[in-house]
Amino acid sequence: MAEPLLVVGLGNPGPTYAKTRHNLGFMVADVLAGRIGSAFKVHKKSGAEVVTGRLAGTSVVLAKPRCYMNESGRQVGPLAKFYSVPPQQIVVIHDELDIDFGRIRLKLGGGEGGHNGLRSVASALGTKNFHRVRIGVGRPPGRKDPAAFVLENFTAAERAEVPTIVEQAADATELLIAQGLEPAQNTVHAW
């Protein structure tokens, strides 16, 4: 992938949401920041938390919006503009209801599937044509509201698996950066 890349982990700010399904993007961004070897700092022009460095040998801007999920675009858009990153060089890491828990899928473009964070980013960029690292959380049981489900903490059984899933999603992000979409999909989708 061309440089620089903007890699964005989606989530909601604050301790109330820190361990919820909707914050998997933030969790992966934290792992990637550790791999870069830097701490997040507030980017004054966008308000997002940002780390700059190299992942998979590529120059990246790693970001976590500090606004609520459904407003993510208002910080991602200014970051993309500030760093002159076109949409096809943006990778958004997020939770995905339509994928089984723990599965990871990569794609470029497509719909938002009811994900308001993706909708906000697409609106701010003026296109849906950006890369996604989709981390499955599965559908809620019974008739539970999906919006409430993603804002709940993981079950005890899920919690035991989350650290491994987050590391795998970070690995998938680095593979996408290093190899491009199709080769990375061939590897990640076989996991």
Curated annotation (Swiss-Prot):
> Which Pfam family, just one, is annotated for this protein?
Pept_tRNA_hydro
Molecular function as annotated in GO: peptidyl-tRNA hydrolase activity; tRNA binding
| Predominant subcellular localization, coarse grouping | cytoplasm
Q: Gene3D superfamilies, from UniProt?
A: Peptidyl-tRNA hydrolase
GO biological process terms, alphabetically, are: protein quality control for misfolded or incompletely synthesized proteins; rescue of stalled ribosome
What's this chain's function? Hydrolyzes ribosome-free peptidyl-tRNAs (with 1 or more amino acids incorporated), which drop off the ribosome during protein synthesis, or as a result of ribosome stalling. Catalyzes the release of premature peptidyl moieties from peptidyl-tRNA molecules trapped in stalled 50S ribosomal subunits, and thus maintains levels of free tRNAs and 50S ribosomes.
UniProt record similarity statement: Belongs to the PTH family.
Name listed for the protein in its UniProt record:
Peptidyl-tRNA hydrolase
Species for this entry:
Mycolicibacterium smegmatis (strain ATCC 700084 / mc(2)155) (Mycobacterium smegmatis)
Per the record, the gene is: pth
